[in-house]
Amino acid sequence: MVVKKVHERSPLRVFERSIHGGLGTGNLGVVLSRPGMGKTAFMVGIALDALMRGRKVFHVALEQSVDHVREHYDEIFTDLARTTHLDDAASARLMVERGRMVHTYLGHSFSMVKCRNALAQLREHLHFEPAAVMIDG
C-alpha cells in the first residue's frame, strides 16, 4: 500500500472528523491517563501520521530517554508497515526519521522557555519548522 492510502485509511481520520477536521494550527490537544496506559504510543501514532504526510514533528520527552522514544517510533512504524503492506517501507522510514526531532528533559528540567529556545534553535540553524509539537510526560 502506498503512503497516501495508509494516511486515508488511518483511524485518525475518524478522530479528526469527530472534532471537525482536527485541532487546527495553534490549538492544543491533551491526552491524560494513568501511567502505562499507552499515552506515548498514542502520541507516536499521531506523530507518525503527520510525518508520513511530509510534516515535521518535534517530540519532547519529559520522563524517557531519546533512545526509548525512538524505540516507540520504530516499533509502531514497523507494525504499521507490516499490517498495511506499505510499499517501500525503507523510504517511508527515512522520511519519518528525517522529519522528527526528539528532545528529552529528564529530572524535572523542562520549562516552556527551554522548549521555545530549542524550537528557535532548530528553526534558525536546521531550518526545522515543526507542524506538530508533542510534549510527552
List where the protein language model places each region.
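Walker A/P-loop NTP-binding active-site region of P-loop NTPases
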Residues: 22-82
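Charged, amphipathic alpha-helical linker segments immediately N-terminal to NTP-binding catalytic cores
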Residues: 1-4
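A short, structure-level motif marking secondary-structure boundaries and short turns
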Residues: 31-33, 104, 137
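A conditional alpha-helix N-cap/helix-loop micro-motif detector
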Residues: 8-12, 39-40, 112-116
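Conserved inter-motif catalytic segment of the P-loop NTP-binding fold
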Residues: 64-135
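A generic secondary-structure signal
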Residues: 18, 45-49, 118-125
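Pre-Walker A adenine-sensing motif
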Residues: 9-22
